[in-house]
A protein has these predicted regions:
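Short non-domain terminal segments
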Residues: 16, 81, 166-168
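Rieske [2Fe-2S] iron-sulfur-binding domain
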Residues: 2-12, 19-143
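A generic structural signal for short, non-catalytic loop/turn and secondary-structure boundary residues
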Residues: 12-13, 26, 35, 105, ...
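Short coil-to-beta-strand transition motifs
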Residues: 12-15, 245-247
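C-terminal catalytic domain of Rieske-type non-heme iron oxygenases
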Residues: 49, 127-287
């Protein structure tokens, strides 16, 4: 059995978008990523647009992610072939003057986009867009991006965890749950907005010092109104509403590297005090 045949080889997964890196990670060098068991290289072309292609040079299949960027062109590390906008080969250094670039020298690019401070790839023809977060266009909210991490867990297992609320009293007693409240609250499943499907519920949480900093409330116990929604294939949006009017919106993203390994990142939107610099808050303050 391979490390992709249980999940990643399913053809339907090729037609969805996956977050593979932060936009800030694509600055001066190409970046290699593995998605659904296949290796890709992503870089910025001369227009600063994100381009992605299989991570192998069509000449001798050396990884293009080992190359470098020259004036927006990706130069291979092995023989110096250069690829410009749209993955087209623009230079074969060993060829004599006047010799045209052969058509097979061009890269077969995949769909690439930037949204929410992240780089997204879709290996096949997209059947749907990148998950919508309307708050991203709302000037009352600001966004925080964190690092993209590599986890030894399947994307399905991670998504299951993000949707599960029965572990809150045991794992998240300082943020999402209380040790003394182990019963799962009554929830109703149904379609939410923007293509998400999920549920809403209320949860009591102990308002410790960290929670008081995040919520702006001094009460020892708070009631949070939470809405959690799933978006195909591995995206979860969780909205936390406080009685003060403060909202936290989390977009939790699992990207399958293979059947047992995933990339994980999350994005947070908040409508709190803009006079407090983001650098003065730890990532834990956002949740």
């Amino acid at each position: 059995m391979t490390r992709t045949e249980l999940l990643c080889d399913h053809p339907a997964l090729q037609r969805h978008w996956y977050a593979v890196a932060r936009s800030a990670d694509l600055a001066r060098e190409p970046v290699g990523v593995t998605l659904l068991g296949r290796d890709y290289v992503a870089w910025r072309d001369g227009d600063a647009a994100v381009v992605a292609a299989p991570d192998r040079c069509p000449h001798r299949e050396a990884p293009l992610s080992l190359g470098r960027l020259l004036e927006g062109d990706l130069e291979g590390a092995y023989h110096g072939w250069r690829f410009g906008r749209g993955g087209r080969c623009v230079l074969v250094p060993s060829a004599a003057d006047g010799v045209p670039v052969p058509p097979k020298a061009h890269l077969g690019i995949v769909h690439a986009a930037e949204r929410y401070g992240l780089v997204w790839l879709c290996p096949g023809e997209p059947t749907a867009g990148i998950p919508e977060i309307a708050y991203d266009a709302d000037p009352r909210y600001r966004r925080l991006n964190v690092d993209v991490e590599r986890w030894q867990a399947s994307a399905t297992r991670m998504t299951d965890n993000f949707l599960d609320i029965s572990h809150f009293p045991f794992v998240h007693t300082g943020t999402f749950g209380r040790a003394q409240d182990t019963h799962v609250p009554r929830i109703e499943l149904g379609p939410l907005d923007d293509g998400y499907y999920g549920y809403s519920y209320e949860v009591a949480v102990n308002n410790d010092a960290l929670g008081a900093t995040a919520s702006g409330l001094a009460a020892k116990v708070l009631t949070r109104r939470m809405t959690t929604g799933f978006h195909l294939p591995f995206a979860v949006r969780s909205t936390i509403h406080y009685e003060t009017g403060l909202d936290h919106i989390l977009l939790l993203l699992s990207t399958p590297v293979d059947d047992v390994t995933s990339l994980f990142t999350f994005v947070v939107w908040r409508n709190d005090d803009f006079t407090v610099p983001l650098a003065h808050r730890s990532s834990h303050d956002w949740v």
